Amino acid sequence: WPASSFWPEIHAAFPDAKIILSERDSEAWWRSMSNTIIPATLSADNDWRRMIDALFKSRFISAIEDKNACIAAYEANNVRVRATAPASHLVTWRAEQGWGPICAALNLPVPDEPFPHVNTTSDFKEWQSQRNQPPKSAGDQ
């Protein structure tokens, strides 16, 4: 994300590529969104806010803080992807499935290491707090 919002355009440019639809429980998705993306849009970073607002309004929903509307839009988006993506290129995947479905779709062996758990809410909040820090001067490095 946010590139996933442009999957039709990306797939048009790379028609042989697989489309990985990452799904999760709608309530879990909302909890993550309301703890990461929504607070970030309310931050003082105007560039971030403009990007999120434009993306949500053009590709998703304008009522970003409306839980029910956002969940409905999330679920409708997943239905739309499943209905419009070429079945031969679509991989529907949930993080708890790990490497298996992705590696199978790509005809690759499953790595001998656990599937990474990254981009958590705490990771996002740390990234966001670092973005909100003033830039370091050359003398601080």
Spans of features found by a protein language model:
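PAPS-dependent sulfotransferase catalytic domain
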Residues: 1-35, 41-92, 97
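Terminal low-complexity/charged segments
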Residues: 12, 31-65, 69, 113, ...
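The conserved 3'-phosphoadenosine-5'-phosphosulfate
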Residues: 20-31, 79-138
